Amino acid sequence: MRIVVVGAGLAGLTAAELLHNAGCDVIVLEASNRVGGRAYTRSAEFINGQGAEAGAEWVDNVHTRMRALVERFGLRMDDNATTWTAIRRWLFRDGALLGPADLAGLDPQLGDELDRFEGFFASVAAGVSDAAHPAQHPQAAHYDTLSAADIVDQLELGELARLFATRNMQGEFAAEPHEVSALFVAQQRALYEAAATPHGEVVAQRIVGGVSGVTAGLASALPQGMIRFGETVDAITIDETGAHVRAGANSYHADQVVLACSLVPLRAVVFDPPLPPELAAAVHGLGYGRVTKTALQYPERVWPAGYATTTGRAQRVYEPTVGHPAESGILMGYTGGEGGTRLADLAESERMHEIELSQREMYPALPPPLGGFSQAWSGLPLFGGSYAVYRPGEITRFWDVLRRPHGCIHFAGEHTATWTGYLEGAVESGETVASRLLANR
């Protein structure tokens, strides 16, 4: 069986290795000049052996596939396990950096209101009997019409709780609250609830040396020449002999095609015959988050430990170099949703300047930065966004259709996984498609 895999990110590499090891004839077409896709560690911009993730960053203790890959390639997780309640620790507002005690003084109800916000989604999640099939929720049609913003309004959250709820949506889903389906949030909560049962408290960690160590390991397991770089697919024709995948002047024949890339570049691909209407609607319509990650390295660390939420342009500021022995450190500005889009419209140097100003407002003692980068995923045509976000109405319309085979066309990538939006989901989707193809050959 000859298979063309489009995309050399985690999903494509996972599928390619499994299919190759099972004896299939596999070619991987990658439009860029590197593997990994949105799993991308950048270190060339920094000194002292430090680096930061331009894309996906966290591997939770419940992400068993990713943990297995980390072990397989001789990597390790860092020692700084983080719980997601840490994002409430600091708030920069009106020129002041406020800690937990300050926040409690400003609004004694803040913690309770945020608990009510999360509690709503937990109650909906209780009706998600299988996180892989959220549309089977008894009230799926109702909850999928609601957005996270609708829930904020229904609960009448106060000013500070609204800010934290907004930043949570911008951070977790890379979108504004009105762009996130309440059913999608509930699906994610149900997934974590089920996964956490055998693992206890869910904590997140980074991979020492970066996630690119995993993608490099997977790529090295494939035969030389299997991955064809600089091959941008522009047409897929299906006839009685199979699929013909065109990338510029080159054409590749396949029995099966695995589309393991973001849906956004597929919107420019000519399919002959055209995709079925419901599938075409999903390919062209599914929402994508907009994250701009701006990492700046400073010669010394003059900031407190922990996440900081800000009303400024950086949205969330944290240190990805916690635990690194060097005196220097990196501050990350994580900007999602409309803020991420606004930054993406600027040149990289302008983005870095904007985030430096925002960080300096928070920490006036910051010395001049040594270097850095700003990665705006929504501004890159090969990706068109950071990761999928199912907007109101899209779970019931798009979830199932993207996870089914369509003749010889199969979709993989985090947008087709139960672990949507995560490195774990990319690996999961590659395994799922490979298993399906091998079961039916």
Q: Model-found features: residue ranges?
A:
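FAD-dinucleotide binding site
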Residues: 1-441
